[in-house]
Amino acid sequence: MHFTTVTANPCIDRTIQVDSVNLGHSHRIQKTICDFSGKGINVSLALTQLGMPVKSVCLSHSDGEAANFFKQKDMDAELIPVPGNVRINIKLFETSTGCMTEFNEKGTPLERETAADVIRAVKNVLPTTSVLILGGSVPPGFPDDFYYELGKCAQEYDVPFILDASGSLLVNGMEAAPVLIKPNEEEYYATFGVHPSITQEFCASYRQILMEHNIAYGAVSLGEKGALLVTPEAAWYSEPVSVDVKGVQGAGDSMVSGFAYAIAKQCTQGDQLLKTAVSCAHASLELPGTQMCPWQAWKKDSRLHLLSSSVRFSMGQI
């Protein structure tokens, strides 16, 4: 197995921990944590910590943050030099409630040719890739069909790809038939105009989207309410598990790493896919800042329920 991730808009997550946020007032900071981040980077780190070989295709700004990170972590990366500094994202984490408020920069504007450079770099490593993971925002200047073009490249090499994005990046990317998509609750609503819910009606609407685009799996991370996995045949729901939440921004990316691992292992059972992914997410929640699941994630237990199946719940019964 060998994984490839793409990070077109890396960042530094500056997590500021406070007891609670009271708008218009001053606050005493409990702790500040800085992590080099980005969806692809985070998935690469999680898979590396799970003992998997990963190639990270990542933009590298003039400030050298990307180069320093991959050297420090001793991770394999194809770095594409670009001008400017990496963007800074501010994360206000309330330790009393576990709630996080985010302020994310857009990133340095770049030319479309840089997007073409990324696509060429990915094509070079696809012959040895088991699963390609695409996700996150793109910098100003990149086309909305960026993930679609990468997905078409993956198709040429018969490489399954996972897409974790939102808006036009997700809508366009779905046309290349990813094996799995994983928007979170907010991203799903922003993209499809429907609030995710743990109901058969929602699963039916999600199932229709998957079938129209030949997508095998559609996940939705629901934060403290758990997670859903929908296929054309069935749907599974994972209950939230009580954990000591110290950081939330790495959980979704850890979940993607779990899906990627299971898919590379040729797991096709929805309940096992979701259990693996949720286990990774739970482990990340117990770490402060933007940190990924360690190997011990596999020891976590997830309570899963078959929410719907083709026998109990099919399109013809709606």
Residue ranges and their predicted role:
Residues L92-T128:
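Conserved phosphate-binding/catalytic loop of the ribokinase/pfkB sugar-kinase fold
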Residues D145-E233:
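Conserved phosphate/ATP/ADP-binding segment of small-molecule kinases
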Residues L45, I90-L92, G226-V230:
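Short beta-strand scaffold segments in enzyme catalytic cores
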Residues M1-G24:
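Positively charged, low-complexity intrinsically disordered leader regions
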Residues H213-E224, E239-R303:
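Conserved post-catalytic alpha-helical subdomain immediately downstream of the catalytic base
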Residues E102-N104, T129-G136, D164, K182-E185:
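Short beta-strands and strand-loop turn motifs
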